[in-house]
């Protein structure tokens, strides 16, 4: 079950407590949750509308302050709390902040009921990239501070983060025009994800084994497609040898 606890592209928000309780208590399926607190985001938008009163849009550089660290943490903390109470299997999508990492465990993947992923964008970019790339790196959750990026990289290596994902969401360049409110959120990532991670391997950020584990083996285990994934890998290795 993919659960949008924060609004993103499309109208799929589920943030009413009764609905959330029904989902967490009513399924033994994996719940994959996009976590951003809608009330916090709404209040931040109003604050920036007042700051830029009369402007056609809010600068895209304000996007990480609108979809802020508190917005991400509040929603992720709620999801983890509900999962623990219900005994549900939970996978937090697109973790983008250092603060959220305290919600997760670095124990072996096989022992976890609650897992987490980081996206390629949050492992590559920081606030400073808005100056050169603008809305092209606008995504939900937002790309945030360098300290968040470095914490996420460390968490991938330590086991707090179990998966590296793409959150592939391509748009026309014309749809990426505008600022924090008008430009569409999302980036094309499938075609760049492996190349980008291999560049980080070359830089010494990750080992090749870690990239394979986080982009292939762990997702296969978490989503229950392990037999197919490993069969294909073994077949490829046999042919290569």
Where are these predicted regions, by residue range?
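Short acidic/histidine-rich active-site segments
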Residues: 114-118, 160-181, 187, 235
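Gly/Ser/Thr-rich active-site loops/lids in small-molecule metabolic enzymes
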Residues: 182-196
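Short, catalytically relevant binding-site loops at active-site mouths
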Residues: 98-99, 121-122, 169-173, 217-221
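Conserved small/polar residues in nucleotide/adenosyl-binding loops
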Residues: 231-238
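Short glycine/serine- and small hydrophobic-enriched flexible loop segments
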Residues: 81, 198-202
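Histidine/acidic residue-rich metal-binding segments in metalloenzymes
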Residues: 2-164
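A short glycine-threonine-serine/GTX helix/turn-capping micro-motif
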Residues: 66-70, 181-186
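Mid-to-C-terminal alpha-helical segments outside catalytic/metal-binding sites
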Residues: 199, 206-228
């Amino acid at each position: 079950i993919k659960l949008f606890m924060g609004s993103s592209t499309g109208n799929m928000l589920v943030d009413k407590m009764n609905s959330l309780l029904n989902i967490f208590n009513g399924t033994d399926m994996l719940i994959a949750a996009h976590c951003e607190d809608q009330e916090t985001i709404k209040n931040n938008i109003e604050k920036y509308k007042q700051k830029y009163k009369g402007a056609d849009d809010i600068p895209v550089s304000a996007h990480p302050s609108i979809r802020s660290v508190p917005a991400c943490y509040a929603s992720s903390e709620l999801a983890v709390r509900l999962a623990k109470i219900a005994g549900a299997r939970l996978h937090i999508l697109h973790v983008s902040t250092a603060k959220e990492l305290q919600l997760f465990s670095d124990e072996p993947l096989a022992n976890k009921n609650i897992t987490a992923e980081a996206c390629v964008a949050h492992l590559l970019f920081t606030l400073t990239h808005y100056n050169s790339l603008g809305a092209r790196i606008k995504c939900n959750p937002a790309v945030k501070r360098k300290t968040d990026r470095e914490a996420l990289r460390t968490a991938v290596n330590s086991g707090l983060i179990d998966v590296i994902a793409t959150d592939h969401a391509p748009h026309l360049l014309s749809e990426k025009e505008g600022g924090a409110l008008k430009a569409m959120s999302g980036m094309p990532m499938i075609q760049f994800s492996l190349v980008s991670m291999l560049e980080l391997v070359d830089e010494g950020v990750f080992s090749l084994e870690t990239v394979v584990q986080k982009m292939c083996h762990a997702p296969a285990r978490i989503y229950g497609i392990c037999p197919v994934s490993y069969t294909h890998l073994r077949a490829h290795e046999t042919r290569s040898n």
